[in-house]
């Protein structure tokens, strides 16, 4: 999919539960001038921007390039007790978190602030007011529980389910498919009509990450028992009687949902998801749920056109609304309300939620400190308001300009690679060149900021703030319907450590936070920067031409621009890369899913090759010197490999392999084996483990 990296599972699920809030951009303020004008003059890592001490030179690079580049770092680095993994993204996120804390706590401590500063401060202060939250106990969620208890028929159930719909998934940008509500909504450019927005309806309703957690044996059976116990505990904390019997019904209902859910591979298939339905089609195509009542309560009564991403799942979930007893649905909705609210209720609820989702599912020993969770919550609700202040204080204009120059070099290099393709016909090349020519790029931060002035934030209402933020974001998305597509919208925050390809708009976004070591250091050697952030930029460019991006034309319309023979060759190369990654086994009983991760792997291979070409172009015929015994090419590939260094707890790694469209970092680092220049750089021999014969090296772009 389109983002460079997905946070670990529990963070991704938390993000789904707390969606960023914003309103219209009319009257949005221009981007503030950066106050952080001066970039450092010396590299943060080592003498030239690379952590040579993190290497393990006893490992042959041709046998395990990840181990060679980062083996000592892996041995000596401890995963923080409050994390399920640690990697380059997390190391930058920790630094960025400190910056966000300075901004947010400063606003909370100043009783004279107004406007967005007051909203930021009040939101955080409400979350941090543990004494008030403890005193309230379960009371903040009681009105919702009482409303659920009063449901008298399936018509009322349909209205409740519709009223709970939120804009809490993102199919093609952030690769977030998870929602614990029965359905998720994504409002984005229409696959078939690029000039307008469409609402995408997505499967949901599960408390655990995806269907295999309910249907598979072995470890999954143990997790189901732990989940059942978690449900019992949450219901008991709320004082709900017959908790064990209710938990049995809830697990049985969610298991039935899991049976009709699409697999991750199917969900990742954009062609299978491009199902245009009229509102009138739902009653016939997915009988069971009273759809007219559902859409009315969801504020979508007048909306006629939808895209249904998993029609079989929508059909199955709708049928369950009709077939399962009303009381079972009431039990389920009561638990969902409590579980969703738990982080904002008293300590016993928050601790129980972490015990299951953090420790049992992810293996994380310790819950993050409350201030860290408060920073996350505030960023989720008021992200661009915090981001504007982050940019003013911490983002160097010099860094932004340097990154923009690198992007231009990478785009030029990719265009030349298209010209040089021997297997592609001129007809297909013409379309590919049009797409690269139409690519637009945003670096650092948006040109205008969202206006949060209409969002109500109360200093004494932590849960209410979250719910109002979610509803506010939902209404912001609904307001897009019927309007022209806004190609200025950012789908990531400046303080977010990630990068993004927006396939429906043929656009790239590089937030400011990723422009930090080890990905980018303005004082580092160019070879290292091109290997690290250059490969990231190349990765995002290449997403426009991966197995999903290649389905879209230069206008973001889903339409086949390939000749049959070219498409056949492209798919054959993709199959070879999928087989290559499926051979990687992080556990004896679990392999990487090469098909699920194919889009990311194509982007890694093409992105690395493009970054190498761009680096060579940047030299303008000059030959850089050897530094500390490393040639320029060696520094380039080592910069790439160290950017992907990381460690997982076993439970988190298993979950990532099952659910993430990105392969684990250690295998992404081995992408080098598909690039010809890597072999002479490290004198890789045919008998070494990573060696691929020239005809086996995957070269798609």
Q: What is each model feature region?
A:
Residues 1-11:
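Bacterial N-terminal signal peptides that target proteins for export
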Residues 19-22:
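C-terminal motif of bacterial Sec signal peptides marking the signal peptidase cleavage site
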Residues 24-26:
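Bacterial signal peptide processing site
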Residues 29-45:
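Post-signal peptide N-terminal segment of mature Sec-exported envelope proteins
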Residues 39, 43, 256, 280, ...:
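Intrinsically disordered, low-complexity linker/terminal regions across diverse proteins
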Residues 41-46, 59-135:
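Active-site-surrounding "flap" and adjacent substrate/cofactor-binding loops of secreted or lumenal enzymes
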Residues 55-75, 214-235, 598, 605-610:
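Hydrophobic/aromatic-rich, well-ordered segments within soluble, folded domains that form packed cores
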Residues 106-409:
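Noncatalytic, helix-rich "gating/capping" subdomain that lines the substrate-entry/channel surface
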């Amino acid at each position: 999919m389109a983002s460079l990296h997905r946070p670990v599972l529990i963070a991704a699920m938390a993000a789904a539960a707390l969606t960023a809030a914003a309103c219209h951009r009319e009257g949005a303020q221009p981007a503030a001038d950066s106050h952080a004008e001066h970039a450092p003059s010396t590299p943060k890592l080592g003498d030239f921007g690379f952590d040579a001490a993190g290497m393990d030179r006893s490992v042959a690079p041709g046998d395990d390039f990840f181990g060679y580049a980062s083996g000592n770092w892996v041995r000596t680095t401890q995963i923080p007790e409050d994390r399920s993994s640690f990697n380059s993204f997390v190391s930058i996120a920790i630094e960025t978190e400190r910056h966000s804390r300075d901004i947010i706590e400063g606003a909370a401590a100043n009783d004279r602030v107004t406007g967005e500063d007051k909203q930021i401060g009040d939101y955080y202060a409400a979350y941090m007011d543990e004494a008030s939250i403890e005193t309230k106990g379960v009371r903040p969620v009681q009105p919702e529980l009482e409303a659920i208890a009063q449901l008298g028929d399936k018509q009322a159930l349909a209205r409740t389910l519709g009223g709970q719909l939120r804009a809490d998934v993102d199919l093609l940008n952030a690769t977030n498919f998870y929602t614990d509500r029965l359905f998720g909504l994504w409002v984005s450019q229409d696959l078939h009509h690029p000039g307008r927005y469409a609402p995408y309806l997505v499967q949901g309703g599960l408390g655990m990450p995806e269907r295999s957690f309910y249907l598979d044996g072995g470890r999954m059976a143990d997790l189901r028992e732990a989940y059942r116990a978690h449900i019992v505990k949450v219901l008991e904390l709320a004082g709900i009687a017959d908790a064990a019997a209710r938990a049995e019904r809830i697990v049985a209902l969610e298991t039935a949902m899991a049976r009709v859910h699409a697999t991750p591979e199917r969900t990742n298939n954009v062609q299978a998801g491009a199902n245009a339905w009229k509102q009138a089609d739902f009653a016939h195509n997915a009988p069971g749920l009273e759809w007219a009542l559902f859409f009315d309560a969801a504020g979508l009564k007048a909306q006629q056109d939808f895209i249904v991403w998993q029609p079989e799942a929508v059909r199955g979930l709708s049928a369950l609304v009709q077939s399962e007893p009303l009381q079972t649905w009431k039990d389920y909705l009561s638990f969902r309300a409590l579980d969703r609210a738990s982080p904002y209720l008293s300590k016993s609820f928050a601790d129980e939620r972490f015990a299951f989702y953090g420790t049992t599912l992810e293996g994380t020993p310790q819950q993050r400190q409350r201030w860290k969770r408060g920073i996350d919550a505030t960023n989720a609700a008021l992200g661009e308001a915090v981001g504007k202040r982050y940019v003013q204080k911490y983002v160097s204009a010099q860094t932004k300009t340097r990154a923009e120059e690198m992007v231009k070099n990478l785009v030029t290099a990719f265009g030349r690679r298209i010209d040089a393709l021997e297997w592609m016909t001129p007809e297909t090349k013409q379309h590919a060149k049009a797409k690269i020519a139409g690519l637009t790029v945003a670096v650092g931060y948006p040109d205008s900021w969202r206006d949060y002035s209409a969002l109500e934030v109360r200093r004494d209402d932590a849960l209410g703030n979250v719910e109002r933020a979610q509803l506010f974001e939902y209404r912001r998305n609904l307001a897009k319907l019927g309007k022209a597509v806004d190609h200025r919208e950012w789908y990531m925050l400046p303080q977010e450590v990630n990068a993004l390809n927006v396939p429906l708009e043929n656009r790239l976004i590089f937030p400011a936070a990723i422009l930090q070591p080890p990905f980018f250091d303005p004082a580092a050697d160019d070879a290292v920067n091109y290997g690290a952030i250059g490969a990231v930029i190349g990765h995002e460019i290449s997403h426009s031409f991966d197995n999903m991006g290649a389905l879209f034309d230069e206008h973001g319309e889903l339409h086949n621009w390939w000749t049959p023979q070219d498409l056949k060759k492209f798919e054959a190369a993709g199959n070879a890369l999928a087989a290559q990654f499926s051979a990687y086994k992080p556990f004896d009983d679990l392999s990487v899913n090469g098909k699920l991760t194919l889009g990311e792997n194509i982007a890694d291979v093409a992105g690395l090759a493009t970054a190498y070409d761009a680096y060579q172009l940047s030299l303008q015929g000059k030959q850089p010197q050897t530094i500390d015994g490393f040639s320029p090419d060696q520094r380039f590939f080592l910069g790439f490999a160290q950017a992907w260094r990381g460690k997982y707890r076993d439970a988190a790694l298993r979950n990532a392999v099952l659910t993430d469209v990105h392969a684990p970092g250690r295998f992404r680092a081995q992408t080098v084996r598909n690039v010809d220049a890597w072999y002479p750089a490290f004198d890789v021999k045919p008998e070494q483990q990573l060696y691929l014969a020239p005809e086996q090296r995957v070269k798609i772009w």
